[in-house]
Amino acid sequence: DNFNIIYSSGTTGVPKGIVQTHRARSHWATSNAIEMSFNSESKSLTTTALYSNGTWLMMLPTLFVGGTLYVMNGFDAKSFVDLVKREQITHTFLVPPQFSMILSLESLQKDWFSSLKTVLSAGSPLRPDIKENILSAISENLFELYGFSEGFATMLKPHDQRKKFGSVGTPVLGFEIKIIDEKGRECSPNVA
């Protein structure tokens, strides 16, 4: 059965509605819980609107493992920081403009974010300077997700952030990836 439809503006292709099934979302919750260390002690903060995949990215794995979910009613950088510090948030999702707003706060201190075990970014690639500032000033526990509207298929994990700038990462647990050429034929390894 269909679960929801996520609409894409066509950033990387043609605008479309992506139908997601209950089975796909169930797999998504399970694989995300494993890949990003969600557990019953997790305190997850969603910063995006309820129709966003970012919200589902926090909500489903958190509820799947019996964690606690916090939902912001609109994003404000100072309120985000205050909530992370006060509630000792362990998992959060932000889009690149939200990171920029946080990084522009005066007297930003990395210890404000010490409770964060997983910081997720998607929606558009992080610029290298923004990524370096996130890693230095917020958290080194950064995961970047790609193919987000479709449910995402690749992930750049924290240990690869500085080693593989510009990479889209590796396939998410349970996914296989193939590269095709402009004629739709599968490419051999090491060919793009």
Task: List each language-model region with its residue ranges.
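Short, well-ordered beta-strand segments
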Residues: F3, K43-L45, Y51, L120
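Short beta-strand->loop structural element characteristic of the AMP-binding/adenylate-forming
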Residues: K16-V19, T46, T68-G74, F143
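Conserved pre-ATP/AMP-binding loop-to-beta segment of ANL
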Residues: D1-Y7, V14, S37-K43, G151
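Conserved AMP-binding/adenylation subdomain of ANL enzymes
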Residues: S26-K43, Y51-H91, L105
